[in-house]
């Protein structure tokens, strides 16, 4: 065995060669690297930001959002897009379902004039476009809606009734292998919206599964299960849904946390409603009977009045949000939604 100084010298030479060939920082000792706060894109619901543990969707990662139909999956993704744009970021939306509603997106705060939109014909085309956009290094967030609609070219060009076993799963596996490393280098958040299917003949456990094979389950750093749990009514009219999101996988913080918030029809996630819920939970807002108070000042009688007060007084809402995030110790990287961490230039 070589002497310790010789081994150290050999290692230093190897590291110098790697840095020269692949760029500075390609290999480093873990202790050398300063701890970097996770840069995030806020979701629009403080309850969900808290459940994620870092204050939003982590940048440079793959996110999967799945659930039943009309549960609020696209709404969650569009709010993240709006927040990324608000911080000066560039967003793209790959509309494989050909169902994006520009009016609704605008109501949620998305700058539709600046949003990059693609409506591809095949799954291969959709993922190739997504890959090229990510490799540009200019994007902050890209949404693929949805995995189930990424139909392989062979299936589109084939006859009805033809068997195409495993084609979509292989397509997703190849795309994610190519994209994951690039996402990390460019700091782009990739949100894949997915649908649910049921496995036949399952006797025990949940028969529900997501489309597109197992690759997305493995590559996703965060998986969100979105469910509609009740309807919100104004008299007899249904005006929105109460939504529950479970963080079923989380590589950046503790998983299995849940968040509940209101999605109002035509308006999206109620940010003020979410602030009230979490504020009461954390004893920052006081609830006495039907009255809500904050630091001795009355917000209103009933949740709707309190929500209206916060909407009309954004400075109070921002103050409550800041106190919640400080108390729970999350959201340190939320302010850097557009910039992300300092990353070395990468030649693709």
From Swiss-Prot:
Keywords: ATP-binding, Cytoplasm, DNA damage, DNA recombination, DNA repair, DNA-binding, Nucleotide-binding, SOS response. It comes from Salinispora tropica (strain ATCC BAA-916 / DSM 44818 / JCM 13857 / NBRC 105044 / CNB-440). One of its GO terms (molecular function) is damaged DNA binding. ATP binds at residues 67-74. SUPFAM superfamilies: P-loop containing nucleoside triphosphate hydrolases, RecA protein, C-terminal domain. Can catalyze the hydrolysis of ATP in the presence of single-stranded DNA, the ATP-dependent uptake of single-stranded DNA by duplex DNA, and the ATP-dependent hybridization of homologous single-stranded DNAs. It interacts with LexA causing its activation and leading to its autocatalytic cleavage. The gene is recA. Belongs to the RecA family. One of its GO terms (cellular component) is cytosol. This is Protein RecA. InterPro entries: AAA+_ATPase, DNA_recomb/repair_RecA, DNA_recomb/repair_RecA_CS, P-loop_NTPase, RecA-like_C, RecA-like_N, RecA_ATP-bd, RecA_C_sf. CDD domains: RecA. One of its GO terms (biological process) is DNA repair.
